Amino acid sequence: MANIINLWNGIVPMVQDVNVASITAFKSMIDETWDKKIEANTCISRKHRNIIHEVIRDFMKAYPKMDENRKSPLGAPMQWLTQYYILKNEYHKTMLAYDDGSLNTKFKTLNIYMITNVGQYILYIVFCIISGKNHDGTPYIYDSEITSNDKNLINDRIKYACKQILHGQLTMALRIRNKFMFIGSPMYLWFNVNGSHVYHEIYDRNVGFHNKEIGRLLYAFMYYLSISGRFLNDLALLKFTYLGESWTFSLSVPEYILYGLGYSVFDTIEKFSNDAILVYIRTNNRNGYDYAEFNKKGIVKVTEDKPDNDKRIHAIRLINYSSDVQHIHFGFRNTLIIDNECTNIQSSAENATDIGHYQDSKINIEDDDIIDDDDDDDDDDDDDDYNPKPTPIPDPHPRPPFPRHDYHKRPKLLPVEEPDPVKKDADRIRLDNHILNTLDHNLNSIGHYCCDTVAVDRLEHHIETLGQYTVILARKINMQTLLFPWPLPTVHQHAIDGSIPPHGRSTIL
């Protein structure tokens, strides 16, 4: 048995037990999905995403003790990149040997250009990641390069490996014309890798990838990383850390980002501002999500037990109205979290909606929210003349609902797009939906500012105008489809300013 003092001083490593349960779940998932065809709208279910997530994290956690003379002078995470360490990884060895090596046997039969089923796709990408090898069988980093001081060489090798994992997923998506299959590229493969460079090298150099309808989640993943660097210094609002691998964020963090990088909301999270964050952790029984809210800066600790694979989610919404509204859609509820129904997945700003919050529940109480009713008994015995000065009256706080810092400031509202009578019906319906989503978002924002009557009046004016154009659109559809009884629906005067849109004054738009 190792000496306890040596263990304390780190001389003898504490051996991590292999999480065989995640390997068993992975094997069952592969068997279950091996013959499931990948079609245009096929995606990986929430349960299966979390199984994949656990496998990659358990593989990382089981890395062997690193030799002092076999560490990268550049700080590269060689324990997950080289055969020297991966072949010593007990989780990796257990995975390859599990069930008489059946998973490894299946993996060896796969070719990226022949994969057509969900189980094949998952097994191929996951085994490429945990084996530390590129599609052509070459290692990410050769063992002889572990101690190399050649920064350009090491960075280029890691960038190639990171890019190839993503390129391989896009290649399969393009061949099958699939929208939502997605695994990502783990955090350690982004060592000194510029997300913007990866994004442009993949999409600018491959004409076939220009169709953003193919591989939507992959595109969203790479686009986000292209506009948000890994180490943001003074701009960072959040920092995730897992096994020494850190990543900072200044925007809301959608589930496809945390899942694709391998982070979890149960990791160490540091918060650098007093802006509120909503940490989504699981689904609930109302077809919504449960979240924990944190306002104070410092270490964020989710104290809830980790939910089961079919319920667990990973996403963080920043409530920060000083941020760039250009990227506010990353925090929209239905983009933030990957829907379990494939056809409902929203991955772009164009389709993003921020509705359904009434189905969600806050499940925690921060220390500042707790009112201490337990008075000190000694205070009751104090002499009334002990304090010669009366207790000062505190400055008044804004009236509810103003529970957070800076809530007296007006929110930034999204601009409402003008209706366009020239567009086709389908385009105008899409535009109406976009306007509704924008108004709904603005209404949610102004809901926190009950005293902002100017903004509320403006929003009411927009809503009334939208109602008029809804009637106008109904008139045109009725006439073009001959599904109308006379007289046509009447476009009433605007309830606030008494106006009628010009297109409501004639029979034809």
Curated annotation (Swiss-Prot):
Residues 356-421 are annotated as: Disordered. Residues 389-401 have a biased composition (Pro residues). It holds the Pfam family Vac_Fusion. Its main location: virion. Keywords: Disulfide bond, Membrane, Phosphoprotein, Virion. Disulfide bonds join 43-342. Residues 366-385 have a biased composition (Acidic residues). It is found in: Virion membrane. One of its GO terms (biological process) is fusion of virus membrane with host plasma membrane. One of its GO terms (cellular component) is membrane. Envelop protein that mediates acid-dependent endocytosis into host cells. Plays an important role in endocytic entry of the virus by acting as an acid-sensitive membrane fusion suppressor. Low pH in host endosomes triggers conformational changes to allow de-repression of viral fusion complex activity and membrane fusion within vesicles. Also plays a role in bridging the mature virion with structural protein OPG152. Interacts with proteins OPG094 and OPG143. Interacts with OPG154. Interacts with OPG152. Interacts with host laminin. Belongs to the orthopoxvirus OPG153 protein family. This is Envelop protein OPG153. It comes from Monkeypox virus.
